[in-house]
UniProtKB/Swiss-Prot annotation:
It comes from the Bacteria. This is Protein GrpE. GO terms for cellular component: cytoplasm. It is found in: Cytoplasm. InterPro entries: GrpE (IPR000740), GrpE_coiled_coil (IPR013805), GrpE_head (IPR009012). It comes from Leptospira interrogans serogroup Icterohaemorrhagiae serovar copenhageni (strain Fiocruz L1-130). Keywords: Chaperone, Cytoplasm, Stress response. Residues 1-68 are annotated as: Disordered. One of its GO terms (molecular function) is protein-folding chaperone binding. Pfam families: GrpE.
Length: 212
């Protein structure tokens, strides 16, 4: 009986050992599976992170290129606008010059005629009031023109300026160190507004020149 009991105990011990080994093996398999799953998860996450970074980098480069393109476009638009403003300003000045010339030129010949009458020397008591009246009218004309920025100029004694004067005759002499206006046949007119100045009619003059 004792021997039978010992055999049973031995068999139970072996069974328990096998069971324990089986459980240990199962646990080892589970650990390996968990480890593999963890590794796969980590690799997947790393790949997703890398893909996300690559995508963000691509978007960033695209955004940079778009910004540079917008900067270039803005610079071109600004340059074109500045050119347009400059052309518009130049065209406006040109149109204004022509308008002023057209308006003033209609007054200049009558003014020239009145100046000739006003310069008439007379001892006639009948004509003197008329000449004085013409002189007063001329002064009013000059005042109106000046208020409109139109200036009359008589350059006698001044250096000759081909931009605002027209030499109709000349003479040479040792007394002249440079080309100088010695007589004015017809006064000139110019328009001036701020720093902008242009000749409406050149003064017609006689000049003295150094001997050649």
């Amino acid at each position: 009986m004792a021997e039978t009991s010992n055999n049973k105990t031995s068999e139970e011990a072996k069974a328990n050992e096998k069971k324990s080994q089986s459980e240990t093996l199962e646990e080892s398999k589970l650990e390996n599976m968990n480890s593999e799953e963890s590794t796969e998860t980590t690799q997947t996450e790393s790949m997703e992170t890398a893909e996300t970074e690559t995508s963000l980098q691509t978007e960033l480069e695209s955004a940079k290129k778009e910004i540079e393109s917008l900067k270039d476009s803005w610079a071109r638009e600004r340059a074109e606008f500045q050119n347009f403003k400059r052309r518009s300003a130049q065209e406006f000045v040109s149109i204004r010059k022509e308008a002023v010339k057209s308006l003033v030129s209609g007054f200049l010949n009558p003014i020239d005629n009145l100046e000739r009458v006003g310069a008439t020397q007379t001892n006639s008591e009948e004509l003197k009031p008329f000449v004085d009246g013409v002189t007063m009218i001329l002064k009013e004309f000059y005042s109106v023109l000046e208020k409109s920025n139109v200036i009359r100029f008589d350059p006698k004694g001044e250096p000759f300026d081909p931009m605002s004067m027209e030499a109709l005759s000349s003479e040479e002499g040792d007394q002249y160190s440079e080309e100088t206006v010695i007589d004015v046949y017809q006064p000139g007119y110019y328009y001036k507004e701020n720093e902008d100045k242009f000749t409406l009619r050149p003064a017609r003059v006689r000049i003295g020149k150094p001997k050649s």
